[in-house]
Amino acid sequence: QFLTEMKTAFSHLYGKEIKKNPDFGRIVNERHMERLQKILEQDAKYLFCGGEADTLQRYIEPAILDLGKDQNAASMQEELFGPILPVLSYHKLEDAVRFVNKRAKPLALYLFTKKRSAEKFVLERVSSGGVCVNDTISHLINPDLPFGGVGASGMGQYHGKYSFDTFTHEKSVFYKPADWNLPVCYPPFTKGKMNLVKFFLK
């Protein structure tokens, strides 16, 4: 049912002939066009709908791939940066969370649900750079909120002061007069010195 609704949504947003819609973009260059076509060829058996390609226009019709439980499909091995949507099936939410957590932490987590309990369950268990519930990309809109990844998805945060802090290195500098030394820092480490150090470390 989800796949059918997605197919209907494509037609609703872009019309029956998506290729003629001026609002639907094209692939950035030939290299990426070839890369995406190769992925579609490798995963052809999973094609639910779409996938029509025009190399001259660098156009690919939005494609939905029904992978079932095949996590090793070509479309699951890299970021796609193209109109290809691989869909994996799961029975329990725990299975989906386990799948995500076995991989590098995502730059963004998009969760679609009407259940607050599902929101809480996922957000408490999945680490990601940012989160959108029932939407995508909108967490980038507010310039006062940080944008960044976790681990492999990126280090540091951006937007406003967060960008300034990311590109600023706070360096500790300690100055001591050249002719001033604390005897307690140097041997011999007598019992008296040890007691003094313990006193200051309490």
What are these regions (language model features)?
Residues 1-71, 92-94, 133, 199-202:
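ALDH superfamily catalytic-core signature
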Residues 11, 59-202:
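Conserved C-terminal structural/oligomerization subdomain of aldehyde/semialdehyde dehydrogenase
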